[in-house]
Amino acid sequence: ALQGFDRPLQQELAQHTSIAQWEYRQTLDEPASLETALVVLHDYLKQHHQPIHLLGHSTAGLLGLLYARQHPERVKSLTLLSVGANPAMDWQAHYYAQRRLLPCDQRTILQRMVYGLLGCPPRDRTEKLARVLEQDLYQSLSPHHLLKTMSLSPIAVEVPLLVCGSVDDTVIDPNQLRNWQQYFLHQDSRLWVCPGGRYFFHYFYAHQVSEQIIKFWNKIFPLKALVTYQNVMEIGV
């Protein structure tokens, strides 16, 4: 439901290299299962004969992180957008916390979330964006629900890791981002904090984010030397 926020960054990156987008969709009666999604993702990536760069935002980033831990030989690098040192934390965890604490209905809290995640969009777009968030509640792989929110310990991976976030994100705050640095195992792993944009900073600052990602990739393996196959895959859930 939230893939539309990824498109500006996809377009920026596509000017430099070929990009494939992998999406995992589940029906409303299917339980959210990261394990099932990992199996499906692995089946897809087995078709590629060389390691590729993985990129994911929020829960999609968590899925990429779990995959890189299981199959580092298939991952050239991993870029995480809005993924904190507690990699399970996402906007839905904040939403359910507010549902438990505040005497408000779903619609009211979703509208509050729109302002928290995006700043102050035009009033006529708030309701539309709230419906997009509602759709994500029912369709995404987020491991949280009304009765319980999930927490994960930091996951260290052997592959080069680029962690990106925003200085004004209320979901993944700068402390969550900085805590990543003690878990960097690869010498080329790094952290970059965007000057704004909140939870969807890669939508509002697509050019600046793409510059950081391209710089990161070039340090690992210059893009001008890449062969002409799908070198980058963005995960969507």
Language model segments and positions:
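Gly/Ala-rich beta-loop-alpha elbow adjacent to hydrolase catalytic centers
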Residues: 55-64
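Active-site loop/oxyanion-hole signature of alpha/beta-hydrolase fold enzymes
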Residues: 7-11, 17-53
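Short glycine-rich catalytic loops that host catalytic nucleophiles or stabilize transition states
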Residues: 22-24, 191-197
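Flexible "cap/lid" loop of the alpha/beta hydrolase fold
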Residues: 69-105
